[in-house]
């Protein structure tokens, strides 16, 4: 079952500056806790679930008597426009090795420079999870060799991470929910991508150096369903905050699971195994389920579960050994000599914390408890900040209307059904994309008139006020293409990603009023002539 988090919550937070590095001897030793080993010294915490004891079973034990223990390590790409230590763009789907700065390729003489926006977004995620965001953090080198790691080391935050502690409320299904403790959040640079050819290994460094935030959880999860639900909840939070897109199919969110088993009475406990690089929620659930079957079978036969790193094959649903972890790898962690500590000023920390929106789980609980909404309806409304804000505005207007009319009381459940039903349906039919401020004033009268016809009328007014006529859009597109000869040459030379530059410039010149799909169609016609 999920355990109640008792992690401490802090208040200060962030914009960054870099100051003189600490002397090597002054950097504190790495913390001993992880998502799946050792005991926690944090006050109020329960002992770790994983044990180094390997005891053989002296009597047959049914599968139902075994408890699965799972911790997660999530690697999420931060949505900053450029990479963590270089100015190269972070763009999925670009031509191989098109977005590579000298530092990303480890060229001699190139030096890292910290991306302040990436640090700010990581701090935002830390505050949202209730973590203790550190005003001072530092980077380390983690040494290992792989074709897609040109430096021969990864820059990470082993000793002094950006945030410690925190928790996340996880809803699994009706009647099953709880709180998952977070151990730490740390910034690190991503690796490149390697692929096997017939007689060689091909390396694409576009991803190398992208900002990752690694989220390490406590081993509080108890099975495949909870592990998958927790990962999905993290994805929703990352997207909700605008920290990143967390698209698992694109590799911008990858999950490792640490799995071990013990008898429910604690008499028999096995070692943990780590299953790496799971890229879908279904794969997470299947990997944990397979490890349950495999590990329990070993323990019931009185055999050891060896501490291993394993891979998962989605075609077979089975895991396989990548490497044995009985002898721990020596990553030779050392302070990063080319980067001073990251210092987040108190005023900036406070500003970032103040800007963190109410999380979906918190909003759903509030709507259920104070507005009396059904849990499922509350979760639907709480899934987007704009929907929550609009429901709150509608509820406030409904209360004001009730006050003016004396005896009439508007049921908040009716307001919620109207927002999620009539309004959302009318928005989809009208083809209006709401981006925040546009449309707020024209729709202010909606709470007093729940009719679909009235909604359609007002949305049509919004669409008319925020869209461009076809002639003006065509003229703008032509002007943009004419003003960007280098991008035009690149596109005609096969660099199709230049299309994004044209569309972006159109949106900039029209202040967001253009339809980007229509703009792309017009531009394609122009550049293909």
From Swiss-Prot:
<dbReference type="InterPro" id="IPR017959">
    <property type="entry name" value="Asn/Gln-tRNA_amidoTrfase_suB/E"/>
</dbReference>
<dbReference type="InterPro" id="IPR006075">
    <property type="entry name" value="Asn/Gln-tRNA_Trfase_suB/E_cat"/>
</dbReference>
<keyword id="KW-0436">Ligase</keyword>
<dbReference type="InterPro" id="IPR014746">
    <property type="entry name" value="Gln_synth/guanido_kin_cat_dom"/>
</dbReference>
<dbReference type="GO" id="GO:0005739">
    <property type="term" value="C:mitochondrion"/>
</dbReference>
<protein>
    <recommendedName>
        <fullName>Glutamyl-tRNA(Gln) amidotransferase subunit B-2, chloroplastic/mitochondrial</fullName>
        <ecNumber>6.3.5.-</ecNumber>
    </recommendedName>
</protein>
<dbReference type="GO" id="GO:0050567">
    <property type="term" value="F:glutaminyl-tRNA synthase (glutamine-hydrolyzing) activity"/>
</dbReference>
<comment type="subunit">
    <text>Subunit of the heterotrimeric GatCAB amidotransferase (AdT) complex, composed of A, B and C subunits.</text>
</comment>
<keyword id="KW-0648">Protein biosynthesis</keyword>
<keyword id="KW-0067">ATP-binding</keyword>
<keyword id="KW-0496">Mitochondrion</keyword>
<comment type="similarity">
    <text>Belongs to the GatB/GatE family. GatB subfamily.</text>
</comment>
<dbReference type="Pfam" id="PF02934">
    <property type="entry name" value="GatB_N"/>
</dbReference>
<dbReference type="GO" id="GO:0009507">
    <property type="term" value="C:chloroplast"/>
</dbReference>
<dbReference type="Pfam" id="PF02637">
    <property type="entry name" value="GatB_Yqey"/>
</dbReference>
<keyword id="KW-0547">Nucleotide-binding</keyword>
<dbReference type="InterPro" id="IPR023168">
    <property type="entry name" value="GatB_Yqey_C_2"/>
</dbReference>
<dbReference type="GO" id="GO:0005524">
    <property type="term" value="F:ATP binding"/>
</dbReference>
<keyword id="KW-0934">Plastid</keyword>
<dbReference type="InterPro" id="IPR003789">
    <property type="entry name" value="Asn/Gln_tRNA_amidoTrase-B-like"/>
</dbReference>
<feature type="region of interest" description="Disordered">
    <location>
        <begin position="17"/>
        <end position="61"/>
    </location>
</feature>
<dbReference type="GO" id="GO:0070681">
    <property type="term" value="P:glutaminyl-tRNAGln biosynthesis via transamidation"/>
</dbReference>
<dbReference type="InterPro" id="IPR004413">
    <property type="entry name" value="GatB"/>
</dbReference>
<keyword id="KW-0150">Chloroplast</keyword>
<dbReference type="GO" id="GO:0030956">
    <property type="term" value="C:glutamyl-tRNA(Gln) amidotransferase complex"/>
</dbReference>
<dbReference type="InterPro" id="IPR018027">
    <property type="entry name" value="Asn/Gln_amidotransferase"/>
</dbReference>
<dbReference type="GO" id="GO:0032543">
    <property type="term" value="P:mitochondrial translation"/>
</dbReference>
<comment type="function">
    <text>Allows the formation of correctly charged Gln-tRNA(Gln) through the transamidation of misacylated Glu-tRNA(Gln) in chloroplasts and mitochondria. The reaction takes place in the presence of glutamine and ATP through an activated gamma-phospho-Glu-tRNA(Gln).</text>
</comment>
């Amino acid at each position: 079952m999920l355990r109640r988090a008792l992690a401490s919550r802090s208040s200060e937070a962030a914009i960054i500056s870099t100051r003189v590095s600490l002397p090597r001897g002054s950097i504190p030793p790495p913390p001993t806790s992880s998502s799946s080993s050792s005991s926690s010294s944090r006050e109020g915490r329960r002992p770790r679930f994983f044990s180094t004891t390997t005891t053989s079973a002296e009597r047959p034990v049914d599968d139902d008597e075994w408890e699965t223990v799972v911790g997660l390590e999530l690697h999420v790409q931060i949505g900053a426009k450029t990479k963590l230590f270089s100015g190269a763009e972070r763009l999925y789907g670009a031509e191989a090795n098109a977005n590579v700065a000298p530092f990303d390729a480890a060229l001699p003489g190139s030096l890292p420079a910290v991306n302040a926006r990436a640090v700010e977004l990581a701090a935002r995620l830390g505050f949202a999870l209730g973590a203790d965001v550190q005003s001072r953090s530092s980077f380390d080198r983690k040494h290992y060799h792989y074709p897609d790691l040109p430096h021969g080391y990864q820059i990470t935050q082993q000793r002094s991470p950006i945030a410690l502690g925190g928790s996340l409320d996880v809803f699994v299904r009706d009647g099953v929910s709880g709180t998952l403790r977070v151990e730490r959040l740390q910034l690190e640079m991503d690796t490149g991508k390697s692929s096997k050819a017939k007689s060689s290994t091909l390396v694409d460094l576009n991803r190398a150096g992208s900002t990752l935030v690694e989220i390490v959880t406590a081993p509080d999860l108890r099975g495949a369903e909870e592990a998958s639900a927790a990962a999905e909840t993290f994805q929703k939070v990352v997207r909700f905050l605008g920290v990143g897109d967390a698209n698992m199919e694109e590799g911008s969110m990858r999950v490792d699971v640490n799995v071990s088993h013990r008898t429910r009475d604690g008499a028999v406990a096995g070692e943990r195994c780590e299953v790496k690089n799971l890229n879908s929620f279904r794969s997470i659930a299947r990997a944990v389920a397979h490890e349950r079957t495999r590990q329990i079978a070993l323990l019931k036969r009185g055999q050891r579960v060896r501490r291993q790193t394993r891979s998962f094959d989605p075609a077979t649903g089975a895991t396989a050994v990548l490497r044995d972890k009985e002898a721990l790898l020596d990553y030779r962690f050392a302070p990063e000599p080319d980067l001073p500590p990251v210092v987040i000023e108190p005023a900036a920390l406070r500003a970032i914390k103040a800007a963190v929106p109410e999380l979906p789980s918190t909003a759903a609980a509030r709507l259920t408890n104070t507005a009396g909404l059904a849990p499922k309806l509350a979760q639907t409304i709480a899934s987007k900040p704009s929907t929550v804000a609009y429901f709150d505005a509608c509820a406030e207007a409904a209360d004001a209307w009730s006050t003016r009319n004396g005896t009439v009381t508007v049921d908040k459940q009716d307001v919620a059904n109207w927002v999620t039903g009539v309004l959302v349906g009318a928005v989809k039919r009208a083809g209006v994309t709401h981006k925040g401020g546009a449309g707020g004033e024209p729709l202010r009268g909606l709470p007093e008139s729940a009719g679909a016809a009235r909604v359609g009328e007002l949305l049509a007014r919004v669409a008319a006020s925020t869209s461009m006529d076809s002639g003006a859009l065509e003229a703008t597109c032509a002007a943009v293409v004419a003003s960007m000869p280098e991008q035009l040459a690149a596109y005609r030379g096969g660099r199709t990603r230049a299309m994004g530059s044209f569309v972006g410039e159109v949106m900039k010149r029209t202040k967001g009023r253009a339809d980007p799909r229509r703009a792309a169609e017009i531009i394609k016609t122009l550049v293909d002539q």
